[in-house]
Amino acid sequence: MNGIMLVGSAIIIFFLAYRLYGRWLLKTWGFDPNAKTPAYKYEDGQDFTPASKFTVFSHQFTSITGAGPVTGPIIAAMYGWLPAFLWIIFGGIFFGAVQDFTALYASIKNQGKSMGMLIEQYIGKTGRRLFLLFCWLFSLLVIAAFGDIVANTFNGFASDGTLVTPNAAAASISMLFIFVAIAFGIFTKKVKPSEKLRFIIGIILLILMLAIGIAYPIYLDRMSWLYIVFAYIFIAAVMPMWILKQPRDYLSAFLLLAMILGGVIGVLAVNPTINMPAFVGFSVGGKDLFPILFITIACGAVSGFHSLVSSGTSSKTLSNEKDSLFVGYGSMLVESVLGVVSLVIVCSAATGGHLPEGTPFQIFSTAVAGFFSMFGLPHDIANCIMTMCVSALALTTLDAVARIGRMSFQELFTVDNPEEMSTVQKICTNKYFSTIITLVFGYLLCLGGYMNIWPLFGAANQLLSALVLISLAVFLKTTGRKGFMLYIPMTVMFCVTLTALVESIYGIFVKLSAGQFVFAVDGLQLILAIALMVLAISVAVHCGKELIGVKDASKAELNN
């Protein structure tokens, strides 16, 4: 087996899936290209801000494409390339893309409501509160994990004190991104340039930022960057979308798409041989293929976090209902392509059936930088650009989840009549207070390091997907739309994630019995794991009762 066959077949399959299955879903559920979307109906200059199709796509794509499609397939390759490849293909088409698209579709059909508010409308207030609490706890895990990843990526010093220029240059470019994005956002808002002019200006700005950042790297240690990153995501979470988040995502999309394109072209040019067996075994290193494979490869196949982006932010900026397929379904398939490229890279770098040493980011960055070097780009510059791309993956996810965590906390205390709100509720629904409380808890978790959080994050992420799928199935049924395509994915995800959480809890108790239990790490994980499991089962019971008991189209009109 070689790289061209895997990447080429994946691209063809994803293209056909978008054209056939994706369009069939949109046609089956119905859309109105002339309807006013929530972005126009409730435009407030803050969260509801109409944007072009590619702008919304760039926001969706850069927000959902975190570290997962790089790290997941590389780690899961220990079972062989075939299980990982099949899960990315089938998971991406029938699980992840369907979930992301349906969440976006349901939201734009319901005043741009987030998943929590949708659950209240179709399932009830209790289900909504439980789901929002789950989402908020999940947001803390994401903030902690990705905050630590970004701070480590920007760390300009090695353990022995030597300077790490690629990291420092990537940090410098990222800081430039923030200020340039604000200026670009104001320019776009005031001048309203054509898409062609906007594209040209975006490319020029990107090249200038890369050149300046590489020439003037910023050397700071991990803790300094941790403070800066959390200060940035506070600002990003409270500022209007059009000022910072949208333009930053638009510019970041060029980087990420170039990275994927570079990886694809590199694979096509080199046609690397796959040096890993197709299948290694059902258990490797004491880790069972089920459920570990399906937890490890999340963002490349299906990720519950994506639904929060679809319903929490993208639905509030979409200008036309027909674009929901391109944004929701299309962005997930592009991310799946990145997952396949990552898988090919690690399997081609294997020797004697053993994976290469190093972190997934190091393996991926080194390989793709090598591809860029083949086209005449100096290796140092290529390595710096790849480090920047990898950090952009995590940083765009980080500022998106900070906003989503803030909104989830606010919605927990929101009531139907604002005049009936107590003083505590008014404080908790304040966007500044809710952002601060979210980031404080995220920061405390972050101090333990992302490796202590990642296993729980993976299980919680996929469990969120199961909850979202069953909630969306209720929406489809109550509005008279076909929802059978969600039944198998939601069942599979529940089985996978509950099994993984039970194994995690069991593993912590084994540590406790062996005297290796550390409360600051294991105790916190145990509390969160049990809380997430109880909340998930409670939400699933509420949704299940509604799904079984409700009659078709009993709660809403088909084309609401």
At which residue positions do the language-model features occur?
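Membrane-helix boundary/coupling elements in multi-pass transport proteins
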Residues: 67-74, 91-93, 99, 103, ...
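Transmembrane helix-loop junctions in multi-pass membrane proteins
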Residues: 2, 17, 70, 82, ...
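Extracellular loop-to-transmembrane helix junctions
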Residues: 2-19, 76-106, 116, 171-181, ...
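Loop-to-transmembrane helix boundary motifs in multi-pass membrane proteins
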Residues: 125-140, 330-337, 382, 411-448
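Flexible loop linkers connecting adjacent transmembrane helices
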Residues: 23-49, 75, 85, 89, ...
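Extracellular/periplasmic helix-exit of transmembrane alpha-helices
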Residues: 267-281, 333-367
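Membrane-interface helix-loop-helix modules in multi-pass membrane proteins
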Residues: 49-110, 121-125, 142, 147-156, ...
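Membrane-interface "cap" regions at the ends of multi-pass membrane proteins
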Residues: 13-70, 253, 292
